[in-house]
Each structure stands twice: as structure tokens, then as C-alpha cells.
Amino acid sequence: MLSRLGALLQEAVGAREPSIDLLQAFVEHWKGITHYYIESTDESTPAKKTDIPWRLKQMLDILVYEEQQQAAAGEAGPCLEYLLQHKILETLCTLGKAEYPPGMRQQVFQFFSKVLAQVQHPLLHYLSVHRPVQKLLRLGGTASGSVTEKEEVQFTTVLCSKIQQDPELLAYILEGKKIVGRKKACGEPTALPKDTTSHGDKDCSHDGAPARPQLDGESCGAQALNSHMPAETEELDGGTTESNLITSLLGLCQSKKSRVALKAQENLLLLVSMASPAAATYLVQSSACCPAIVRHLCQLYRSMPVFLDPADIATLEGISWRLPSAPSDEASFPGKEALAAFLGWFDYCDHLITEAHTVVADALAKAVAENFFVETLQPQLLHVSEQSILTSTALLTAMLRQLRSPALLREAVAFLLGTDRQPEAPGDNPHTLYAHLIGHCDHLSDEISITTLRLFEELLQKPHEGIIHSLVLRNLEGRPYVAWGSPEPESYEDTLDLEEDPYFTDSFLDSGFQTPAKPRLAPATSYDGKTAVTEIVNSFLCLVPEEAKTSAFLEETGYDTYVHDAYGLFQECSSRVASWGWPLTPTPLDPHEPERPFFEGHFLRVLFDRMSRILDQPYSLNLQVTSVLSRLALFPHPHIHEYLLDPYISLAPGCRSLFSVLVRVIGDLMQRIQRVPQFPGKLLLVRKQLTGQAPGEQLDHQTLLQGVVVLEEFCKELAAIAFVKFPPHDPRQNVSPAPEGQV
């Protein structure tokens, strides 16, 4: 009974409520907006204080409600047809450009965004929609730093979302005007796909349109308003600007408002990561997307000071594009904000390449390589000015540390090292930049040498097989460093004693210092004939004579600590190279192959030369040289094992290895310490100074003493690396648990 009564009441209310003519209401609201421009004489009243925002809101609500009431999905209702036929969006775009009344541009952006987002019917294929959309994008692009940035980024967010849903829209939004122009030139109809005859775009004729109320004083499009609009409302098409969605997004990415910039960057990322190959190809071939992104990177680079301290650059390493501002707790220095902006944008470029479609990623990586690496950065790296070399090298190191995308890493490696994979020769002409960087490792300026060595150390940690191949492995192929006809040593007893080593001089034997005692080990060998790991480890540990060792007098400087660290680093390195398919054992020597002279390569040569001068170089430089050599020794390739970490290989005539270089240094040391009075005491004091346990007073022979400390620690580090590596581990297998204790 109650339900029947409720139904009767509902029918009564419905009968008394007048039916709403949506089209009539829609036209009345539009007429109210146009009449404001015809009748109003006050040009100072803000738009938000007029009835324009309310009328636009009513028009939007009518469009949404009409669509919800449509019986057949996908059909345009009378109000939407009216919007399309009478080019309301184009008129609004013109009003927004005039910025009359003040704040009208903001209202137009909001209306466009809400219509495109809330109306489900596909709109962007229509000429009367995507043409004003393009105009509005160009309008936003001309207002850098304007008060409408928030509305502009919301507008681009809607567009990027629509493009992601339908990648075909990209062509219409980016270059719809040009498409229409080409069609007109060819005599083709201007109706774009999905236009229908019932609501196609027309100039002024309303043939085929549903009957509608006559709007008093109305004429076609914006013509009724022309006599009442300021002079600056001429058509945007007349300009020569090429602004579009890409340039608008890039402009918003540079906003001072962090939220606006971040949202614009996210929108651009959404655009380039579309899965459609056709859209990706169009983005690369028919838009200025990649050049514009790289152009901004180059501009940010040029905006930095000519000289930046590498230590200052290091404080900002790791800046993310999501948080590009410099940390407030860091010390300020000239150019800090410019540096933070550059590193943040480079990180964004790297992230774009990582997430983008392969077609876009490759094109953007090549653009970065050609326009930034080669044209902008390389001249600074090759400059004669030490300040330019220092700053550009430190910046390149910071960029490498941030670099994650495989495509950009591939381009960076080719830029730095070239593409030649043949073994090097002493007199060849290597890749220009590579040759300069190698020369910088042995520069007269110790600071440049240290900075360049840091660059190579960072490069060695990147997951690209071409790096270690170009620097080291291509010269070790075929094992030409091994003496022909020399059998592998079967035990320690078969190896050359230090006393018989030709690198030692008679003065060393007569110096009164004892040579390293031979370890009392069983002549055990590993399963493949290699010298037992214990013998190799002790060879490095016993290399520095007891008279030149001081670590035993201090805590936490033992070999165990190095083993623990080496295990973690080796595990990380093995994981990085696991997919490179390296062999587990050295390549067998081929007796039928002609013997070729061995050259360790330009990179190892400069490292060995630096290592041979360890007793005469600054402490910080020695630390960096040994750090790079340790990184090399960690690689789980059998030829690197053999050449850098096996003291018992029979070297070919004229060849040197890391161990033989160390033996020469020890020979030189044993001669020089005779001339240093109170050598053991001074050496211990220097070690305490380096560890902060003693005041840093200046001593005689301080460089020599610091070099001895580094030498001892480096030998322990090599012993630890050998311990965790030998017998060679399969880089495709997990390494065993970290060993404890000392060998």
C-alpha cells in the first residue's frame, strides 16, 4: 500500500515539474556569455566576479547530463552538436587570448580541461576541437611563468591521458593544423576521421543541424564579438610559432613552481612511454620532442659557472628529477642551484629513455650523444684550460653515477671509448677523446689525474661489457703475456724466488733488510693446475717486508676486514657480469698461432706507470690509483685473474704484470728506506696521522712514508680479492658465503 502511494506521489511531482529543454538552456547560457562582451563596458572587472564562470559550469553540466541520458552510447546529443558546429571552443580560445575580462584565460583552460575529461564522447578527432586545443596550447606556451600555469598543466594532463588511451590522437593534437592545410592544398575534404555528416564542422552554414532557437545578435563563430574585442584577439594561426603539446610541456617543466614542473615532467613521461609503435615513430620523426629535450639540457649546462669544484659537485650527486632542488643542509657555493637544475634534468632525460618506447628511447639517446656529449661536453673535455677539464670531467663522473638507461649508457660508452674492439698497439691513434682521457690520468695536475681516474672507476661499475673489453680484455685475448713453452708452475717451489727476480738489484740484497719469508706451505695446487689460493694470497701478504709494515700495531687494519669488503664487491661485480657469457678458464695457448708482441693497452699502461711511482706521488692520488686497480681485479674473467692476480705466471719477454710492478716498487723501497733515519717510528706516526690518531704535523719524507702505507694496504686488498676469487667462480653462479678469519 505504501509503495503504491509513493509511486502516485512521484507521478504527481513529475507531472507538475516542467520538462527541461537542454538545448534551449545550453544556448541561453552561451548567449549570456556573448552578450556580456556586447553589452559590458567595464574592462577591469575580473572574470571570476562576472557570471561567466557560472555559465560555463552550467554548460559543462548540461553536456555531461545530456550524455548520461543518451539512449545509444557513442551518439552526440544536440548540445554537443551545437558546441561542435558553432565552434564555441574556438571562440572561447580567442576570448582567452584577449584575457578580457581579466582572468578569462584561466576560465577557458578550466573549461577545456573539464569538457575533455568529463565528456566521454571522443572529441579530439574533430577539427573544431583539436584546432582550438592547439591554439590554446600555443597560447599557454607564450605565457612563460604566467598565473595560469596550474590550469595549463591540468589541461596537458587531460590531453596526455587521452593520447595514452588512443595514441592516434597524437598526430591530431601535435600537427592537426598542418594536416588540414595539406588536405586543403590537395583538394581533400577537411573532415577528419570519426566526423559524421550530422555534426561535421562547417563554416557558417547550419544545414543538417537540428532545429534550434535563434540567438539574438548571433553570427557565425567569433564574428559577433570582433567589433567588441581588443585588437590583440587576431587569429593565432597568423603567428609563426611552432608551439604545441611538446613545447608546452617543456615550458611547464621549467616552471619555478615545483609541483607544476613535476606534473609536467610526469605528463611528458606519459607521452613518450606509449606502447604504440606508430605513435612512437610519429613522435620521433614528426615532432621536435627529442631535440627540444636535449636543447634544454644543453642550456642548463651552459648556464652553470665555468669552474666548479669537484668536491662541490660530489655533494649534489644523486639528485633525482623528482626532487631536483639542492639539499638545504648542504653548504652553499656559487652555481649550486644551476648545478642542481642540470643534474636533475639529466636524471630526467635518463629516466625518459628508460621508460620510453624503444623507438623514442633510441632517438633520444642519440640526440643526447650528438647534441650534448659531442657538441657541448667534448670541447670542454678537450680544452687546454685545466679548469675546464676539471669541471667537465667531474660533471661527467656525476652524470655516469646517475645513468641507468641501457640506451644512453651505450651511447656514453661509444662517446668515451670509441667502438674499436681490436687489440691496441703502442703507436696507434686511439679514439680522440679516449686518448685525451688516458693522458689526463697522467696529467701534470694531480687534481686532474685524480678526477679522471674517478671517472674511469665509475665507468667500470656500469653494466656494459664493452667498457672492460675496450679498457683491458681486448689486449689480453689469446694470452700473449704468457711466455711460450713455459709450463704452468705446479707448486710454490717451482716458482722464481724473490732473491732471483731480475727486478731486484744487488743493493737490495745487501741492504741488511730481510726479504719476505717464504710461506711454509704444502705444494698443493688446485684442481685445474693453478697455484693454490693460499700461496697466491700469501705472496701478496708477504710482498711488503716486515720492516715496512705498521698495520699490526693498530686495530681494525687487518686482512680480515679486506676479505669481508672484497667478498661484497666481488658478489656485486659477479652479478653485474653474469649475462656476459665469460669463460671459466683461460683460453689454451695455440702453438700454431704466430706469436704477437704483448701490449697491456693504454689504460693499464698508465695505471702501471702510476703504480710504479707510488712512493713519489701524493697520498690522495695513490688511493685513487689503487682503487681503480682493485676494481679491475674484481672482474671474474680468467684472463684478468691470471694477469692481475697470479704472481706465478711466466711472463713473456718484456712484459710486466701488476705483481711484477709491485716487486719493482718493493725493490726501490728497500733502497730508499736506508736513507731515512728512524724509518719504523716515522712510518708508524704517519699511519696514525692518516687514521686521525695523531696530529698532522709535517715530517721529512712524508710522501714516501704515506706511499709505503698505501702499498701495504693495497697488497692486503689484492690478497683479499684473490682469496674470494680463486679458484675462479662461475659468474653465473652464486658465490659461496663470505669467509671468516685469516688465511
UniProtKB/Swiss-Prot annotation:
This is FHF complex subunit HOOK-interacting protein 2B. Able to activate MAPK/ERK and TGFB signaling pathways. May regulate the activity of genes involved in intestinal barrier function and immunoprotective inflammation. May play a role in cell proliferation. Residues 186-219 are annotated as: Disordered. It holds the Pfam family KELAA. PANTHER family: FHF COMPLEX SUBUNIT HOOK-INTERACTING PROTEIN 2B, RAI16 PROTEIN-RELATED. The gene is FHIP2B. Residues 196-206 have a biased composition (Basic and acidic residues). InterPro entries: FHIP (IPR019384), FHIP_C (IPR045669), FHIP_KELAA_motif (IPR045668). It comes from the Eukaryota. Belongs to the FHIP family. Expressed in liver.
